[in-house]
Amino acid sequence: MNDILNKEPMEEDYGIEKSLRPQFFNQYIGQDKVKEQLEIFIKAAKMREEVLDHVLLFGPPGLGKTTMAFVIANELGVNIKQTAGPAIEKPGDLVAILNELEPGDVLFIDEIHRMPMQVEEVLYSAMEDFYIDIMLGSGDGSRSVHLDLPPFTLVGATTRAGMLSNPLRARFGISSHMEYYQERDLEEIVKRTADIFEVEVIDNAAIEIALRSRGTPRIANRLLKRVRDFAQIMGDGRVDKAITDKALTILDVDAAGLDYIDQKILRTMIEMYHGGPVGIGTLAVNIAEDRETVEDMYEPYLIQKGFLMRTKQGRKVTQRAYEHLGYVYNEEE
């Protein structure tokens, strides 16, 4: 995939995303349904002087799950400790993290679906009853130690909710699905980022960037950064529609946010298989990508935008894809 359209964070994104991160719900653009629900749950928990139920945030990468976790902590007025599933390799790692929590704190675990099962099992009692039992020593000299924990809120984030075990999923009192962003919300995000970067965006350039951002704020901010470079070198420093079109064309991002590989998938299906149906394995071989990459990186957006559909027989290209790429659509094919 064109790196600029990759929803996973790149090294350059980390510092930028932290500087752009909203602190409270009233600064957070988009995800209105999720925000409305969480605001109610947080207010109710604070009124009862209880900790907020554990929260699961799930959805595609780049949609602001980490940002939402920090907003939750700020709205609760508590500290947040951040880690990731792959970083918690053994139960002792989890115990060390839990032992540092203060009453009411938020523990944020990104990529929670990647925790080892032995770690996950320790987490069950911590989430449900705020205690853990740990084994010290080995063999005949081993003994179990009961450790009470302060009440806390676990916020877990995942792009693969289906990979969570049923026992773990059942312990989250709140599950929030983060969805792709509407263009109007992405436009506001681009404008907000431009203000922070002190870049002037004019002539509907923000709309154009939003339309090509694959419904993802991370990509919108990344595109703005790159267009800003073009505006600085090839223009007067202002980001207008003309320089935006030119920059994104050079970057191989078309009007619908499709990159070279997206188009290659659709063109291969149209030219070699008359639009399908075609099996995902066969398609992956034809475009020289592995099956998992096609399924995880490309297919969801193509389906979401109405360019591709799944059938029992395989994947099929839609009439919209034909028209977008300039092919004549024959309904009988």
Swiss-Prot record:
Keyword DNA repair: yes
Positions of region (Head domain (RuvB-H)): 255-333
Residues reported to bind DNA: R291, R310, R315
InterPro entries: AAA+_ATPase (IPR003593), AAA_lid_4 (IPR041445), DNA_helicase_Holl-junc_RuvB (IPR004605), P-loop_NTPase (IPR027417), RuvB-like_N (IPR008824), RuvB_C (IPR008823), WH-like_DNA-bd_sf (IPR036388), WH_DNA-bd_sf (IPR036390)
Reaction(s) this enzyme catalyzes, per UniProt: ATP + H2O = ADP + phosphate + H(+)
A GO BP annotation: DNA repair
Tree of life domain: Bacteria
Subcellular location: Cytoplasm
Matching SMART domains: AAA (SM00382)
Region of interest (Small ATPAse domain (RuvB-S)), ranges: 182-252
KW Transcription regulation (keyword) present: no
Binding site for Mg(2+): T66
Record function comment: The RuvA-RuvB-RuvC complex processes Holliday junction (HJ) DNA during genetic recombination and DNA repair, while the RuvA-RuvB complex plays an important role in the rescue of blocked DNA replication forks via replication fork reversal (RFR). RuvA specifically binds to HJ cruciform DNA, conferring on it an open structure. The RuvB hexamer acts as an ATP-dependent pump, pulling dsDNA into and through the RuvAB complex. RuvB forms 2 homohexamers on either side of HJ DNA bound by 1 or 2 RuvA tetramers; 4 subunits per hexamer contact DNA at a time.
Assembly information from the UniProt record: Homohexamer. Forms an RuvA(8)-RuvB(12)-Holliday junction (HJ) complex. HJ DNA is sandwiched between 2 RuvA tetramers; dsDNA enters through RuvA and exits via RuvB. An RuvB hexamer assembles on each DNA strand where it exits the tetramer. Each RuvB hexamer is contacted by two RuvA subunits (via domain III) on 2 adjacent RuvB subunits; this complex drives branch migration. In the full resolvosome a probable DNA-RuvA(4)-RuvB(12)-RuvC(2) complex forms which resolves the HJ.
Domains: entry comment: Has 3 domains, the large (RuvB-L) and small ATPase (RuvB-S) domains and the C-terminal head (RuvB-H) domain. The head domain binds DNA, while the ATPase domains jointly bind ATP, ADP or are empty depending on the state of the subunit in the translocation cycle. During a single DNA translocation step the structure of each domain remains the same, but their relative positions change.
Protein name: Holliday junction branch migration complex subunit RuvB
Native species: Lactococcus lactis subsp. cremoris (strain SK11)
Gene: ruvB
